[in-house]
């Protein structure tokens, strides 16, 4: 055997003898290896998609059919409620009517009659003093004959100016009854109705215990203007 070389090397590349490189195919004339790898990957991807679709069809990804809901049972209609009963309310205190009144007023035959008149041209009584016996039924006639065209009344109070002022204030708050004292006004013993100019009115009452008492007019401003008088009750 001779190791002598001839003028060229006997070593040949594997690729040249096989007709292609590793990335060109397995043998000469065959498809490139990269193409074969792409085809294999595509086939695998297709198989994966088919498997996923099969699982979805089998129920893995199929949307569940909604279950029918139970029909709600009809509820009973609410029982009719009765309207709340009206609570009794306390009636407001009745205002005094424009009429005679007072704690000493009586419905008896008078034993004595007395007349008082309004001054014709002033806010005053023509008679500024009276005298009557105690515990006597008296009818007082009041004549409002004046030239001023104003209203007047006659009110007997159980005391002096301090008591008269309180009675007068109560009457001022009773405009709906033309400023006569309201019923049960403390210390208002007797009064006539409020009279227009030219009218007359009367009140029957029992005289109080012996002493000195004021009588006034309770039309607004008249008592403060000095329209008052004194009743002296004798034993």
UniProtKB/Swiss-Prot annotation:
Membrane topology according to the record: Peripheral membrane protein
Segments forming domain Plastocyanin-like: 111-235
UniProt xrefs under InterPro entries: BlueCu_1, BlueCu_1_BS, Cu-binding_ET, Cu_oxidase_CS, Cupredoxin
Primary localisation category: membrane
The organism's place on the tree of life at top rank: Bacteria
Keyword Ion transport: no
Induction remarks: Present in both photosynthetically (anaerobically) and dark (aerobic respiration) grown cells (at protein level). A later paper showed this protein to be present in both chemoheterotrophically (dark) and photoheterotrophically (light) grown cells, but with more protein present in light grown cells. The second report is thought to be correct.
Membrane-traversing stretches: none
Annotated region described as Disordered, given as residue ranges: 1-27, 64-107
GO process terms (BP): photosynthetic electron transport chain
Pfam families the record matches: Copper-bind
PROSITE patterns, sorted: COPPER_BLUE, MULTICOPPER_OXIDASE1
Compositionally biased tracts (Low complexity): 1-21, 87-100
Protein modification: Glycosylated.
Keywords: Cell membrane, Copper, Electron transport, Glycoprotein, Membrane, Metal-binding, Signal, Transport
SUPFAM superfamilies xrefs: Cupredoxins
Cofactor note: Binds 1 copper ion per subunit.
Positions of Cu cation binding: 152, 217, 222, 227
Cofactors named for this entry: Cu cation
Job of this protein: Probably a soluble electron acceptor for the integral membrane protein electron transfer alternative complex III (ACIII).
Name assigned to this protein: Auracyanin-B
The species this protein was found in: Chloroflexus aurantiacus (strain ATCC 29366 / DSM 635 / J-10-fl)
